[in-house]
UniProtKB/Swiss-Prot annotation:
Residue positions of the active site: E215, C249
Record keywords, A-Z: NAD, NADP, Nucleotide-binding, Oxidoreductase
GO MF annotation: an example: benzaldehyde dehydrogenase (NADP+) activity
Protein name, UniProt field: NAD(P)-dependent benzaldehyde dehydrogenase
Pfam families in the cross-refs: Aldedh
Catalyzed reactions per annotation: benzaldehyde + NAD(+) + H2O = benzoate + NADH + 2 H(+); benzaldehyde + NADP(+) + H2O = benzoate + NADPH + 2 H(+)
Amino acid sequence: MNYLSPAKIDSLFSAQKAYFATRATADVGFRKQSLERLKEAVINNKEALYSALAEDLGKPKDVVDLAEIGAVLHEIDFALAHLDEWVAPVSVPSPDIIAPSECYVVQEPYGVTYIIGPFNYPVNLTLTPLIGAIIGGNTCIIKPSETTPETSAVIEKIIAEAFAPEYVAVIQGGRDENSHLLSLPFDFIFFTGSPNVGKVVMQAAAKHLTPVVLELGGKCPLIVLPDADLDQTVNQLMFGKFINSGQTCIAPDYLYVHYSVKDALLERLVERVKTELPEINSTGKLVTERQVQRLVSLLEATQGQVLVGSQADVSKRALSATVVDGVEWNDPLMSEELFGPILPVLEFDSVRTAIDQVNKHHPKPLAVYVFGKDMDVAKGIINQIQSGDAQVNGVMLHAFSPYLPFGGIGASGMGEYHGHFSYLTFTHKKSVRIVP
């Protein structure tokens, strides 16, 4: 994979600045045509994406169709259907102090944008922000993850087929290339990744007063109440925790269950894991050998009891689906976002305790999941735990709705996107007053 020199990166950045200045990207018809070209290029490279995602992350086709390609195509179709509505100026009243006048709000493009893609859903979480940049009327430079090289190469091919580089371009690379890109005066930056790198991005953006969106992560709790449907809960855990080998920013990071139903729940869960995820690579591949080693070290240090799993093969980047009971808040497994197929289990004795302990130890997660039949209690919990998003009796699928904003709060991120929210994120609200 060829990396560009700093001089060539600077040249590309300047070319995008010049192209944006022509205002070609502001034309609504141009934006729609760009979405159509992106859609066509993704479809034409579907088989290549299947192969690349299988190699990089061990993703089966059904997961790719749902959470990678399908998610992108659905987002494109939604934007095409609604863009005319979104770009229309919004008229507002003129108070007496500024009358007579006509007042309205328009959304203007930022300019040259920079999207830093992650490794875990490298197609969806790179191209969906790009859709926002396009519908906002911007140009865009994309740096996909260097840890998923096969998929990043296909993304570069898709972009090259769909767009001229002065409009949208991919720059491959690692830390050095990203550091140089972050030194440039972009008009907007969209980052998906870890909180530690997010801080670096924000510090770099501050030097140019560049607005940012940070899509980060955190330890998302799945809280199980005494009246929960245990079979439903296990179904959602099997999907949410172990898809993509646990490498999902909104995956349930830990299970926080009322003591009265813990044993019954774990009996069901462990049996399902043994039956449906019996192999060491049943959940897919971890992104690097280093990630396997990190998770193995945490398992070796835990004071909890492994109920199932914990088999690892570093060379295959594989770790079996693992459930660990008897975990306390100070356990190594609770020290950081796991981002792997390990489910620590903690128990609580009252709703008040559950709320207080989550807020104390891992506040403001990207998502909170509550399972129970009493909606007043369940809604009370999600109303008292600050989080990016929340669900009752379900996990993760809120991220597939273009009608819902997706984003974090505090350490789990800032800003949001999807659907109309992507358009709002990638544009500036401009107030206009016209005096007759």
